């Protein structure tokens, strides 16, 4: 008896995205030579027909660009946030606040 734990749908959707990305990346047409200079001036009909039947090569390229930009923004944002949080000037555990600040008034 098989039980579904919720990762199966995630796996299927990830597989579909990777399959679509793979077909997008590998759907380019190879350059085929034409019929030759002596056999006519028309274009290679096989290449033209094949190109017309395939979907556009860059149909989903904007999604890839947005994905890369999003990852870059998250990386830079986390670096900036981590740096600013680590550089807090007025920390209560600072030795100045613990030992020196209260004793200066006694002198």
UniProtKB/Swiss-Prot annotation:
InterPro entries: K_chnl_KCNE, K_chnl_volt-dep_bsu_KCNE3
Chain residue ranges for the region called Interaction with KCNQ1: 72-83
Subcellular location: Cell membrane; Cytoplasm; Perikaryon; Cell projection, Dendrite
Membrane topology: Single-pass type I membrane protein
Pfam families found in the cross-reference section: ISK_Channel
Location of region: Disordered: 31-54
Keywords, ordered alphabetically: Cell membrane, Cell projection, Cytoplasm, Glycoprotein, Ion transport, Membrane, Potassium, Potassium transport, Transmembrane, Transmembrane helix, Transport
Summary of subunit composition and partner proteins: Interacts with KCNB1. Interacts with KCNC2. Associates with KCNC4/Kv3.4. Interacts with KCNQ1; associates with a KCNQ1:KCNE3 stoichiometry of 4:4; produces a current with nearly instantaneous activation with a linear current-voltage relationship and alters membrane raft localization; affects KCNQ1 structure and gating properties.
Family as reported in the entry's similarity comment: Belongs to the potassium channel KCNE family.
Protein name: Potassium voltage-gated channel subfamily E member 3
Originating gene: Kcne3
